[in-house]
Structures are given as structure tokens and as C-alpha cells.
Amino acid sequence: LIDWNAFQIFNVEEVPENTTWSLSTDLLSERGVAFGTLYEYQRDDMFDLPGLSRGQLDAWGLQDHGTDNLGRDRRNVTPERDFRGRIFWQHRQLLRDGIQLSAEVGLISDRNFMEQFYERVWDQEKDPMTGVALKKITDNRVWDLAANIRVNDFFTQTDWLPKLDHHWLGESIFADRATWHEHTSVGFGTLKPATAPLDVAEQAKFDLLAGEEQKYSGIRAASRQEIDFPMQWGNVKVVPYLLGEVAYWGDDISHQSVTRTYGQVGIRSSLPMSRTDANIKSKLFNVSGLAHKVNWMLDAYWADASENMDRFPRYDALDDDAQEHYRRRFFFDTFGGIAGQNIASKWDERMFAYRANMQGNVSSPVTEIADDAMTFRLATEQRWQTKRGIAGKQHVVDWMVLNAEILLFPDADNNEGQHTGMFDYDYRWHVGDRFT
């Protein structure tokens, strides 16, 4: 791989300030010659619009003469196109009156290109989108007007033409006795399912997920509100709350219009505790004093929805494209699925989100997740903190972290016939500044 300074190659005498432009060439012995370019910029105005802007254009491609090696039983996959590559552009600009303009282009040649040539980006970074958005943040209020289209037909994505979101979070009402949160959205969405692979072996393990089997198109509007009543009972913080939503879909999985009402009432509480002992020291474990901080938490709620969750298409994605790509194979590899069937509800990712109370979040990224429930969530957050650094300049660090939670379901039907489930834990030991 060789990178070239494009400004020098093309003899550009007046290089725009705060910009870099490179060209790249690469020879892949078993695949072919590749070419690419990367242009990065940060300017005070762009497109004749005043305001600080920054962004990047990254393009790379090759005439591919090889095959893809994507893991077990995918060692020799024939690419769907001979010329393969991607064009990726991101732009963000601050306009007048605090309005933020964002634009993005994410064009990919075929379904396996990113997994083969950009595996870290494929696994870890956001999905490539093609669209534009305007956003304005005023104190605790945000409105967001966006439009995007699907340009890669091998991914399941929703075109929004357009979609308007409004958030109003943490607003104090009733003379500071309550707190109000709101999220309202309306848009015209077209859910476009992914096309099947051309490779015969890939096609044999491809089946669309439940809720994305067809093309769905229509208006979706929803408004979700929550009112909290925070109280202090001695050392315990208690927050009774009421949450409600009214949502409308112009096209459900049966191509009918439907209105759903949803209500949730519950109580959240937390009890913080701590103990500090400056005499605990260890050179071996790099400990100089120890503070143990614990927060015990409870979230108990009852919820009721007028419509079942499985009535709605996946207008909002739960997972990134990479995870959806895997889930379609997961159905065959792990569960021996048959094309046309769906994974059991016990393993359906929508049910995991529902049991984890995604619907209890006013700003939930997935409107479709909501159903009847009665759940108790018991959780603890624990920190063991110490001081590190040279004398006189010590700083506090989390030496160990242990978080754990368990969900209890009085009605076992809400949890696949089990009263307990979804036990999660997260333990981290920060041995040193460079190793965890």
C-alpha cells in the first residue's frame, strides 16, 4: 500500500486551509490492483453556507479476481461483482441559529465487501447511510428533521422521506415536584428487505428475519411521554413514574393501518452506600487507599399495550447490518432452521429488548418494541476506587468494577415460562494504566 499526496501530484499551488488529500495504490497478489482516495477537510464555510464544517470522503476499490474467505463454511465465496469498492462521505456543518447540518453517503458494491476488506469497520462502526439531516438543540429540547434512502439493496433498511423527531427531556414541572420527558416523531417510511445472495452456498443459509419479510410503506407517528415524581426517603431515592404512548402505523405486517396505545406505571429506587479506608495499600496491586462505592437499584413496573409487538414491521432496526447479516445465518447454523420459518421467540432479539424494558425509555430508538409486562429489575453497581500517580499529583481511578442485574417476572408467560431470567454481570479489573 502506497499513499500519495494528491495536492503535490496535481501541482495544486493554493492548498485549501485545513484540508488533506491523499491517493492510494495497492497490489493484492491474489486479487488485483486497488486504488483509493481520502479527502479530509475542516472549513469555515462550505456549499456557500456560513458556519464551521468538517468531513471526509473515503473511496477505495479494485477489479477483484479472487474469492472471499469469510470464516467456517464460507472459505471460498464468489464475489457478486467483479469491480468492488465503497464510497463513504460524511459531512457536518454548524449553520446559523444553532442549526446543525449533517449529510452522509455510504455506497458499497456488494454484501460481503466490507466484511472481507474492512472487517473492523464492519464489526464496530455505524452502518453506512445515505441521507441528510437538520438538527437544533435548545437547552433540553431537540428537533431533528431527516431524510435518507437505501442505496445498498443487500441490507434491510428503511427509507424515511422525511422523518421529524422532537425530544424534550428533563423538564421540571409542578414547582419542581415532577419531571417531564417527551419524544414525538412522525415520518413516511418504506421498509425495504434485503435481497438474497447470488452465491448458492450463501443463499442456502439466507432467510429474512421476522418483521422484514416484505416491503412495507406508510406513515408512522408516535408520541411517548413520561412524568417522574422524585422523592427522598431517608437515604433511599424513590421515583414513581407514569409513561404513556400513542402510536400509529399506516402499514403493519398485514398491510393494515393500526393505532397502538401503551401505558407503563412503575417505581424506581436506589440506595447508595460507600466506605473508605486510606490504610489499604499494596505495591503489588498498585493500590493506595481504597473506597468501595455501591448503588443498589430497583425498577418495578407494570405495562399494558393495546396491540401485540409482533404485529409491526421492523421500521427501526434493533441491530447493525453486521449483526443482522449474522442472525440470518445463525438461524440455520445454530438452530437448524428451515427457510420460511422464524427463530423461536425465546431467542428473538425483539423479545430480549422487550424483556430488558426498552419500551420504558422515552427516547427508545425502536418504536415497535412495547408489549404487556410486569417485571422487577434488581441491580447493583459497585466500584472499588484507589489513587494512582506520583506524590502530589495522584488521581482517582476505578480499580475494580462489578455491575450485575437480574429480572423477575411474576407472570412467567412474559419470560418464556420462567419467573427469573436475564441475569447479566460485568466485571472489570484495571490492573494498570495500560492493562484491564
Sequence positions of predicted segments:
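Outer-membrane beta-barrel initiation region
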Residues: 1-51, 118-137, 365-398, 410-421
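Asp/Glu-centered strand-loop micro-motifs enriched in Gly/Pro and often flanked by an aromatic residue
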Residues: 1-12, 22-24, 29, 76-77, ...
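Surface-exposed extracellular loop regions of Gram-negative outer-membrane beta-barrel proteins
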Residues: 11-22, 27-75, 105-109, 127-146, ...
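A short acidic (Asp/Glu
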Residues: 32-37, 67-69, 112-115, 156-158, ...
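Outer-membrane beta-barrel translocator/channel fold
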Residues: 58-94, 102-120, 183-217, 257-261
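Recognizes the extracellular SEMA beta-propeller fold with strongest preference
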Residues: 83-112, 128-149, 154-162, 166, ...
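Short linear interaction motifs
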Residues: 115-116, 124, 147-148, 281, ...
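Outer-membrane beta-barrel translocator/pore domains, especially the C-terminal barrels
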Residues: 135, 139-140, 159, 163-436
